[in-house]
Regions:
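C-terminal alpha-helical interaction appendages
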Residues: 1-81
Length: 81
């Protein structure tokens, strides 16, 4: 998971573009938007993170850095760290 890639997706892609990219990657297709990553798993992680962060920013009315922190804390908890 690379934060600069997630930030770029949050800033440049719409919800619809991100959701379509997620679907494309899951179906082993090339997404319509550029999604950087070493493999499809990392690309999917970046897209899913960007979707979660955009939703959090909208729901809570918070800036990207705060939403990113909330996301990384959520990930740490889910992996037991």
């Amino acid at each position: 998971m690379k934060m600069p890639i997630i930030k770029k997706l949050v800033e440049t892609a719409s919800f619809e573009e991100l959701e379509n990219a997620e679907l494309s990657i899951l179906e082993e297709q090339q997404p319509d938007i550029e999604v950087e990553g070493d493999d499809e798993g990392e690309q999917l992680t970046h897209v899913m993170a960007a979707i979660w962060i955009k939703k959090e920013m909208e729901k809570e009315g918070i800036p990207f850095p705060k939403a990113l922190r909330a996301y990384t804390q959520k990930v740490r908890v889910s992996i037991g760290g």
